Design a protein with these regions (language model features):
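Basic/aromatic-rich interaction segments and small domains that mediate binding to polyanionic partners
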Residues: 2-3, 8, 12-60, 72, ...
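Long, low-complexity intrinsically disordered regions
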Residues: 64-80, 85, 90-99, 129-173
Length: 173
């Protein structure tokens, strides 16, 4: 486990570049050790839907020292082979996402190309509690039930799936 300093989720802040106010709903921690935040600007578009989210680094956000917290991430899992037990989806653990409710997902990137499209196989995210791998400690059945009751997992399909080559921090959702 590695301790990292992050901005608390649900923090209301302003993006310095766009000057838009909004709320932090997720953060992602990658293999390089950097953190990006999913920023939901306040407001609705012409169709009455929320304005598209932005991935932003901490330096773009107007926040104070009280908005930070220290959390532990299982850094040792990144770069290792991981499998989602329910689907069998297997690949390298490339990043983590913390949801606003506290649930922790791992992004898995398989090897190879999608034969139909000739593009890298799309990465997918899964609740870490439902995955296995050499560096993942399994919870007992009782621990799992308690954890899921305290921090239920949102559906991984919360985010639009895009080819890995287009799915970079800083991209609008």
């Amino acid at each position: 486990m590695k301790k990292i300093k992050v901005i608390k989720l649900r923090t209301v802040c302003t993006d310095k570049a766009t000057e838009l106010p909004g709320t932090l709903t997720h953060w992602m921690y990658n293999m390089g050790g950097s953190v990006d935040y999913l920023f939901q600007p306040k407001g609705l578009n012409e169709e009455g839907q929320p304005v598209k989210k932005l991935y932003l680094e901490a330096e773009r956000l107007e926040v104070g020292p009280e908005d930070f917290e220290e959390v532990e991430v299982p850094d040792e899992i990144l770069g290792t082979q991981v499998t989602d037990d329910a689907s069998g989806f297997t690949g390298m653990a490339i990043s983590f996402m913390r949801h606003v409710n506290g649930c922790f997902h791992v992004f898995i990137q398989p090897k190879g190309l999608n034969k139909k499209e000739g593009a890298p196989i799309q990465r997918n995210d899964f609740d870490l509690r439902g995955c296995s791998g050499k560096m993942i400690s399994k919870l007992s059945e009782l621990e799992l039930k308690k954890s899921e009751a305290a921090v239920p997992s949102p559906e991984p399909a919360t985010f639009e799936r895009e080819p890995a080559s287009e799915d970079l921090p800083g991209k609008h959702f």
